[in-house]
């Protein structure tokens, strides 16, 4: 056996990636054990950050991809990022993509910054090999081929991609999801679905993970149309969006973890999130970003279900905002073990009593089964210390109080640490842990 064949596969792949297609092909005549490795291209990447026309280097890159197809090479991962694209360049790009698809690509990433009438080649939606696909950004997916079918696709990421609804062809978004029989994860970034023409429904019986992230939070005065979520097998849900007018259908029966950030963008809202709140019933880990999001559980408190499975709750809080909504959540979470909050709520300087009426002396904590409490924004003020004392006196099951303190002064750190460790605790098992950040 030759010495080259003894090299690890990772080293061989690295050597091959530095060679031209022609040079790499010649290697199979040098070492028989390189034959299978040479025919596999681990990654092919092209990044053009210029705003001008496609460079000659991309045309050379496209030629190499064509040679790889002619030599029956396979491409594991392909990434194409173009800062701009004009009509005259559409054919060059799409021919390159067709060659990539014929090379049996597994991981396909496209970031083509175009605002015109550009359309992806239809073969994108009939690729039998691709397992992970990322599409972006700015173009429209209007019509899918009738034979659209992505039998191996498990992860689909859409970045600032818009969809259209045709009276004859129907909803292109719905058709795309239906063409993915094993899809497990869907990520929609830059989601301004009021700009979409679609069915306003995310429906899948097999989807496990869904992320919807809005990038623009400016309200232009238009209404935010309803969205339905019919995803009974979903286990992970990350939803950062503006509030919708309503959520007609919400089926999230298998939900394990949910992260929500739903700020209100305008006064006089007509939104209705009752079904969305009810749909979270089976969640085990719930993270609520933005104070507005938690406030929804107070506004629609009659719709809040009993969270039998919830054991970890993380919420955004502010020292000047009442805890009425947090009380609702705690009362509806009989098996909660871990609670993470940002700031403690208290009255400001000059008040005789720093404890707000909404807290009712913290008596509502007596029935809470919380074992771990984390406070991530603590300044060590007298009013804050008083709130911690009340908390420790009322959480009977508490095992760990973790407090993050923002200070860099050594003497201040020592004083805060000493004050916290001196506070009485209702639970003899409770330990106080202070982290300075």
Curated annotation (Swiss-Prot):
Residues 1-49 form the F-box domain. Disulfide bonds: none annotated. It holds the Pfam family LRR_At5g56370. PANTHER family: RNI-LIKE SUPERFAMILY PROTEIN. This is F-box protein At3g62430. It comes from Arabidopsis thaliana.
